[in-house]
């Protein structure tokens, strides 16, 4: 897992065009009132910079949660992990992204049936939650890198 710090050469003040009109994912509709505003992507996905970090995903254990190899996850350490949260966990000092299930028996659940759940004792020191995934960034178009 690749750790990417939030602080970078970017100031976080850059904005990109944002068209506030909702776009249908079903049948197309006439373009009505496409108003352009500006959106600061950093302020949208990073609400608490001091407790936020980015990770790049590798592997396919979370594909049914639409988290794919190469995606970037935005993780907030200050968010309280709850039943059903997608979390970053350390198991015996190895990191993974999984869904946290607390009932009926605590486990880290992969979102791919090819992988088994990872059951654990909540009082165990071998499992530590390192944060809750708040956003994921997926690249859709092929772009030259």
Task: List each model region and its residues.
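Short beta->alpha connector loops
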Residues: 79-80, 114
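Structural motif
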Residues: 70-71, 85
